[in-house]
């Protein structure tokens, strides 16, 4: 019984803390200019003269793509993968001159009702372990 309660508790907690998806980003290009963009949206950087960038996500990992054009229509001139650590926590790409701040997290897999049910199940499993 304790094994089953432990398993239910672990699965419930894992479901509650499953990865968040960040939907907005601020990109700082070496202090020269800062622009905000949304996930999967082509965004002009440094005004119309500076090209553009786009951030996409695949399996919890994000990818920054920089383009020479303002429409993201040619092959990316720079591509770099990164992970969002926390809301409003800046991530410096390996190149060192690009800082990305992940913003607007959402748990894309849970509705409030699902979260409440998982919390109740986890709480019940924890009580069962104590008995």
UniProtKB/Swiss-Prot annotation:
Protein's gene: ponM
Compartment(s) where it occurs, according to its Swiss-Prot or TrEMBL record: Cell membrane
Give the free-text PTM comment from the record: The GPI-like-anchor contains a phosphoceramide group, rather than a phosphatidyl group.
**Pro-segment residues?**
107-131
| Top-level taxonomic group | Eukaryota
The job of this chain, per UniProt, is described as:
Binds F-actin and nucleates actin assembly.
Residues with lipid group (GPI-like-anchor amidated serine)? 106
**Topology within the bilayer:** Lipid-anchor; GPI-anchor
Q: What is this protein called?
A: Ponticulin-like protein M
Keywords in alphabetical order: Actin-binding, Cell membrane, Glycoprotein, GPI-anchor, Lipoprotein, Membrane, Signal
Per the record, the similarity remark reads: Belongs to the ponticulin family.
Record's signal peptide: 1-19
What is a GO molecular function of this protein? actin binding
Its Gene Ontology cellular component terms are: plasma membrane; side of membrane
